[in-house]
């Protein structure tokens, strides 16, 4: 399947980046067809930056690249899920994720234990 960029007026579609191991959502960005093709070719996540109005490879300044493990396209062909391995913090603030979550298996297991205790 290929993404359908014609569904949006600006040719951009949302891209969810998820950690390949922990499954924690790292960030949300947007891609046009050129960014998608570059991401597939180079195996590093590249977005179309709406603020910079250009292609932007995550980590191009910081070195915190997102290496692509797999690319999934939703049933409507208008949203992309990329499972990636981060080379460091994902957010420009230095946080593990752009949602200020810890991206560790220990954190995930701790949250799971807390959730299970609240059900009992």
Residue ranges and their predicted role:
Residues 10-32:
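Active-site and channel-lining beta-strand-loop segments
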Residues 1-12:
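Short, basic/aromatic recognition patches
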């Amino acid at each position: 399947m290929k993404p359908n960029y014609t569904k949006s007026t600006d040719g951009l579609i949302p891209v969810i980046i998820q950690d390949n191991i922990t499954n924690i959502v790292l960030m949300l960005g947007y891609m046009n067809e050129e960014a998608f093709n570059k991401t597939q070719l180079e195996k590093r996540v590249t977005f179309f930056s709406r603020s910079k109005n250009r292609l932007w490879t995550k980590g191009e300044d910081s070195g915190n690249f997102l290496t692509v493990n797999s690319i999934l396209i939703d049933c409507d062909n208008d949203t992309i899920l990329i499972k990636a391995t981060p080379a460091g913090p994902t957010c420009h603030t230095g946080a593990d994720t752009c949602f200020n979550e810890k991206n560790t298996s220990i954190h995930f297991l701790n949250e799971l234990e807390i959730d299970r205790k609240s059900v009992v």
